[in-house]
Amino acid sequence: MAIRRATQAEANYIVQLSGKVMKESSMGYAENGVQNAYNLFMPIIQNGGYFLIDIENGRVRGWILLATDWNAVKGQVMGNLLSAYVFPKFRRSGVALDLATAAINELKALGIRTIQINVFDGNPSRILCEKLGFKPVSTVMELDIQ
């Protein structure tokens, strides 16, 4: 197993894959769609964000997108963990923990003091986030009006 920064070609491939798992990773909130993934993640990558990938025997087992951004509320640059995904075959094997830890360490090396992650309601990855020390800070609520 190796965790490393994705190449440009791998990042494009992962964005395409992300479009195919959006519904699952958002607990049904977002529809699958490669174009949706490009619209969501390419601006982040163009602004300096990048994927870390877990790769074994030439096969991607999972990924996490990390980025930094100015947070006006906190008055500081903060890290963001986005688009974390592990293929079902590799879940419960430590891949997600290894990816998240590597991403946290990379952000820490950049001098980032606070990291945020968005976890959709009902997503079991919330347990891992809490294990890593993440705490809820807000709840996004939504009302559909017809």
Give the ranges of each region predicted by the language model:
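A short helix-loop-beta-strand connector motif used in the catalytic cores of GNAT acetyltransferases and
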Residues: 42-53, 62, 80
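A short beta-loop-alpha structural element at the N-terminal edge
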Residues: 2-16
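Conserved acetyl-CoA binding element of GNAT-fold acetyltransferases
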Residues: 75-88, 142
